[in-house]
UniProtKB/Swiss-Prot annotation:
This is Small ribosomal subunit protein uS11. Keywords: Ribonucleoprotein, Ribosomal protein, RNA-binding, rRNA-binding. It comes from the Bacteria. It comes from Nitrobacter winogradskyi (strain ATCC 25391 / DSM 10237 / CIP 104748 / NCIMB 11846 / Nb-255). HAMAP family: Ribosomal_uS11. Located on the platform of the 30S subunit, it bridges several disparate RNA helices of the 16S rRNA. Forms part of the Shine-Dalgarno cleft in the 70S ribosome. InterPro entries: Ribosomal_uS11, Ribosomal_uS11_bac-type, Ribosomal_uS11_sf. One of its GO terms (biological process) is translation.
C-alpha cells in the first residue's frame, strides 16, 4: 500500500558557454581540475582520484593527464572552446594537465600561477631524510 519510490534522474542541462577558467590544483597527493565560467560557477570537474587512481598513483603526471582529458570532454559538451588556466600547488601534475587541456582542442589564452605563498604562516612539515 506504500508509495513506490520514484527516483528522478537529474539531467545536466547544456549551457552554451564559449570561454571559461580552468583551475588546476596539483598537490603532492592528487590533482584536481575544475572548469568554471567567468563568474566562477562550476561547469565540470575531475580529479585523479575520481578517475580510479588510488594511493601514490594519484600524484603521477599521467593521472593528471587522464583527469584533464575527462574534464575537457565534459566542458566541450557545454560548448566551451577557450580557456584561461590558473595553476596552483607544488605537485607533479601541473604541466601534464596543462598539456592535456591544450591537446584536447582548447585555445589557452593565459596561464597564471596562483600558488599561495605564506608570509611566514604555518610551520612546515619536517624535512624528508632518505
Amino acid at each position: 500500500m506504500g508509495k513506490e519510490a520514484t527516483t528522478r534522474v537529474r539531467r545536466r542541462e547544456r549551457k552554451n558557454i564559449a570561454s571559461g577558467i580552468a583551475h588546476v590544483n596539483s598537490s603532492f597527493n592528487n590533482t584536481t581540475i575544475t572548469i568554471t565560467d567567468a563568474q566562477g560557477n562550476t561547469i565540470a570537474w575531475s580529479s585523479a582520484g575520481t578517475m580510479g587512481f588510488k594511493g601514490s598513483r594519484k600524484s603521477t603526471p599521467y593521472a593528471a593527464q587522464v583527469a584533464a582529458e575527462d574534464v575537457s570532454k565534459k566542458a566541450q559538451e557545454h560548448g566551451m572552446r577557450t580557456l584561461e588556466v590558473e595553476v596552483a600547488g607544488p605537485g607533479s601534475g601541473r604541466e601534464s594537465a596543462l598539456r592535456a587541456l591544450q591537446a584536447a582542442g582548447f585555445t589557452v589564452t593565459s596561464i597564471r600561477d596562483v600558488t599561495a605563498i605564506p608570509h611566514n604562516g604555518c610551520r612546515p612539515r619536517k624535512r624528508r631524510r632518505v
